[in-house]
Design a protein with these regions (language model features):
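Hydrophobic membrane-insertion alpha-helices, especially the h-region
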Residues: 7-22
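Short solvent-exposed strand-capping/beta-turn motif centered on an Asx-Ser/Thr pair
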Residues: 65-70, 83, 149-151
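Short acidic, flexible loop segments centered on an aromatic residue
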Residues: 74-85, 159-161
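A surface/secretory-pathway sequence property marking extracellular, secreted
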Residues: 82-123
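Short beta-strand elements of extracellular/lumenal beta-sandwich folds
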Residues: 55-69
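Short beta-strand elements
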Residues: 168-195
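Low-complexity, acidic Ser/Thr/Pro/Gly-rich terminal tails and inter-domain linkers that flank the onset
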Residues: 30-52
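Low-complexity, intrinsically disordered segments enriched in Ser/Thr together with acidic residues
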Residues: 131-152
Length: 195
């Protein structure tokens, strides 16, 4: 009988310690950890030509770096507001850790630099290349081909976003025009002419 009382008391003390740790100590220690600060930056963008003939392929080369602390993930997005389908886009080569993702109009996307808080439907075609994780100081590159299907100005949007998105430097650029996700982009363009 005495052993049962001691055992019951020991179990009760262990449960009190466990719940105290899980309800107070662990949450406080996790909240005290400062979020990492990755710094996304696109270091180089080049287009294969300033002018192309209709039906001719345009090659976009993009290089990005994480100049901050390690990122859980960093994405480089290349958007094509003139294209309403992904048929004319392909990745030529890349050294990112994950497989690039083609995004067709109508796909649900996160927006305003949030993971899931805010979302929008894609209005135009784009491609996302990314690495998970993306270590501090690491650089990745990709070459993407797009074939414009109309004459006139063919626009390319480029941006990079690092997660956790814990400060303004986690996205690049920090200002400019907003894309379909209400995120800043750099704009590039070529003139498409009759062949």
């Amino acid at each position: 009988m005495l052993k049962a009382i001691i055992l019951t008391g020991a179990v009760a003390v262990a449960l009190v310690i466990y719940f105290s740790l899980s309800l107070y100590v662990f949450p406080q220690s996790y909240q005290a950890i400062e979020a990492r600060k990755p710094q996304a930056i696109v270091t180089n963008v080049s287009l294969s030509a300033p002018d192309i003939a209709l039906g001719q392929a345009l090659t976009i080369s993009v290089t990005a770096t994480n100049n901050g602390e390690d990122a859980d993930m960093q994405i480089v997005s290349v958007g094509f507001p003139n294209l309403t389908a992904t048929d004319n886009i392909k990745i030529l080569k890349h050294n990112f850790d994950q497989t690039p993702i083609l995004i067709a109009p109508g796909k649900l996307l996160s927006s305003e630099y949030s993971d899931t808080d805010s979302s929008v439907l894609a209005q135009y075609a784009s491609i996302e290349v990314f690495s998970r994780p993306w270590e501090a100081g690491k650089t990745y590159s990709a070459q993407i081909e797009a074939i414009p299907n109309t004459e006139g100005k063919f626009v390319v949007f480029i941006k990079s976003v690092a997660l956790p998105h814990s400060w303004e430097q986690a996205h690049y650029p920090q200002r400019g025009i907003l894309d379909q996700q209400k995120e800043f982009v750099e704009t590039y363009s070529v003139e498409v002419t009759k062949p």
